[in-house]
Amino acid sequence: MLKVLEGPSLAERTTLRLGGRALAEVRVTSRDALDDLPGVLQCLGGSPLMLGCGSNILAADGELPVVVVSLDMDDAPTIVGETAEGVVVRVGAATRLPRLLGQLASWGLAGLEGLAGIPGSVGGAVAMNAGSYGCEFGTVLRSVEVFSPDFGLADVPHENIEYAYRHFGLKGCHGWFVVTGADIVLRRGESAAITAAMRANYLKKKSTQPVLARSAGCVFRNPAPGVSAGRLIDQAGLRGKRIGGMAFSEVHANFLVNEGAGRSDEAFELLQLAQEIVKRRHGMDLTLEVKILSWL
């Protein structure tokens, strides 16, 4: 079944708490309903925006020409087999990362401890190839279940998946698609040790990142291996820099935070300022990691 809502507020659906209204939101409550999704999107107009927990989105204010697509399917993590590479776990895209990590720890399955403290959904982690502390989601992917208007609902094996630093794609697919689930491969370990590692990683994040603030996570990609975007912003003198209600965090300069009454234009101004100063001082381009939604 598909549920259509008119004019959802993106400020209410994103962790930055910024943005105007989308044309509509389509909530997918079952896989059987996915076949109807292309027709519904065509009738509604606008570009489809796949949205999980909204933790990597910076949306402009005003009316935006997008239709939000969200999954309302509770696919709990399930062990479905074991191979020479490890234990295979199937998980739905709407599952929140903390829930997945907690289940993996209880099962004694290791491989994603570095993602502790990252908000968001499994679908978002796949789509952005989420990573932290030497761990990337793409490295544990065995296959991805996706829906596309080109080939319907399908399981895409690892060899047909493209992933790199904060990048995910499907070979031969050039249009939009919805990630609905994934099979991941983990290695066996000790539950207590895995839980301890996750807790240590979370506490480290909490002490070095504004994990409880209204933030979209890191806004810029690291421009090169070993080169931190946050350090470049800090060296540019922009740690704690404020414009209106938006600021680069005092805790970690690569985090843009909404201090309560921020506006999208203030956020865009800060991002542009950082790019200009870092380019002038270091000759390096800062590429956005956060997804921008605007009128264009």
UniProtKB/Swiss-Prot annotation:
Keywords: Cell cycle, Cell division, Cell shape, Cell wall biogenesis/degradation, Cytoplasm, FAD, Flavoprotein, NADP, Oxidoreductase, Peptidoglycan synthesis. It comes from Nitratidesulfovibrio vulgaris (strain ATCC 29579 / DSM 644 / CCUG 34227 / NCIMB 8303 / VKM B-1760 / Hildenborough) (Desulfovibrio vulgaris). Pathway: Cell wall biogenesis; peptidoglycan biosynthesis. GO terms for cellular component: cytosol. Belongs to the MurB family. Its main location: cytoplasm. GO terms for molecular function: FAD binding; UDP-N-acetylmuramate dehydrogenase activity. It catalyses: UDP-N-acetyl-alpha-D-muramate + NADP(+) = UDP-N-acetyl-3-O-(1-carboxyvinyl)-alpha-D-glucosamine + NADPH + H(+). Signal peptide: none annotated. Its EC number is 1.3.1.98. This is UDP-N-acetylenolpyruvoylglucosamine reductase. Gene3D superfamilies: 3.30.465.10, UDP-N-acetylenolpyruvoylglucosamine reductase, C-terminal domain, Uridine Diphospho-n-acetylenolpyruvylglucosamine Reductase, domain 2. Pfam families: FAD_binding_4 (PF01565), MurB_C (PF02873). Cell wall formation. It is an enzyme of class 1 (oxidoreductase). The active site is at 166, 218 (proton donor), 289. Its cofactor is FAD.
